[in-house]
A protein has these predicted regions:
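Helix-coil boundary and interhelical linker segments in multi-pass alpha-helical membrane proteins
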Residues: 1-2, 48-58, 102-116, 161-172
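Structural signature of hydrophobic alpha-helical transmembrane segments
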Residues: 1-10, 55-69, 113-125
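Ordered, amphipathic secondary-structure segments that act as subunit-interaction surfaces
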Residues: 69-106
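C-terminal ends of transmembrane helices
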Residues: 14-24, 47, 72-85, 130-140, ...
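N-terminal topogenic module of multi-pass integral membrane proteins
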Residues: 1-40, 44-56
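Cytoplasmic-side transmembrane-helix entry/capping segments in multi-pass membrane proteins
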Residues: 29-37, 60-64, 85-96, 120, ...
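Short, structured motif recognition centered on aromatic/hydrophobic residues
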Residues: 33-37, 44-50, 119, 123, ...
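Small-residue-rich transmembrane alpha-helices that serve as helix-helix interface/gating elements
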Residues: 173-186
Length: 204
């Protein structure tokens, strides 16, 4: 089940990356590159930091093919995307939590503790989007008050709590997927935001 969600997630993330590249007027190569970075960048950063080799997309090059195809398809169906915004927000929410779970599980399988596992989950969940926004010369989404990285962080610790309470692994995954997905959609619906820090060094 988690593999299927992962495939859906990287496809959706690749398409959002392609749209971001399109808004910047990039050529097809740029579109494919941004799409792949968005979909696979978080997992790659996690693998490098944890020394988890080979990288996921190197071990499974079909993921690279899938994200590239998703980017090309997006070029042709981009005019329809505005009508599918709600669907993409839902898929993105699923992807965020699925990536977070995979990041946590990868760290735990390597023998790391809960703190490292939670950080691994957040990196996997959000870093692809950070790289996308940086490459597209935008302020990363997670730094703009919106509850995104926070959802990933809470989902990671909720999953770890479930494991600590010795819930069956599949049950822990399902509960985390549901709660993280619901929290993300509620944050979007009700515009929940993190407090903003504004510093002005003018002396009066």
């Amino acid at each position: 089940m988690l593999l299927m969600l992962y495939l859906i997630a990287i496809t959706a993330e690749a398409m959002t990356g392609a749209l971001s590249a399109g808004r910047r007027g990039m050529d097809w190569f740029g579109v494919v590159l941004i799409a792949c970075v968005t979909a696979l960048g978080g997992g790659s950063v996690r693998d490098v930091l944890l020394g988890h080799y080979p990288l996921t997309w190197v071990k499974h090059p079909e993921y690279l093919v899938l994200t590239s195809v998703a980017a090309i398809v997006t070029i042709f169906i981009a005019p329809l995307m505005r009508h599918l915004r709600s669907l993409f927000l839902a898929l993105d929410a699923v992807g965020l939590v699925a990536f977070t779970l995979i990041g946590c599980m990868t760290a735990l399988e390597m023998g790391h503790g809960m703190l490292v596992a939670s950080v691994s989950g957040v990196i996997t969940g959000v870093f692809g989007g950070i790289l996308r926004d940086i490459f597209c010369n935008d302020i990363p989404l997670i730094f703009r008050r919106e509850l995104y990285a926070s959802v990933s962080f809470l989902a990671a610790w909720f999953y770890l709590l479930c494991l600590y309470l010795q819930l069956p692994s599949e049950q822990a995954i399902l509960l985390t997927l549901f709660s993280g997905f619901l929290l993300r959609l509620l944050a979007i619906r009700f515009h929940w935001e993190m407090p903003k820090f504004v510093y002005n060094d003018d002396v009066h």
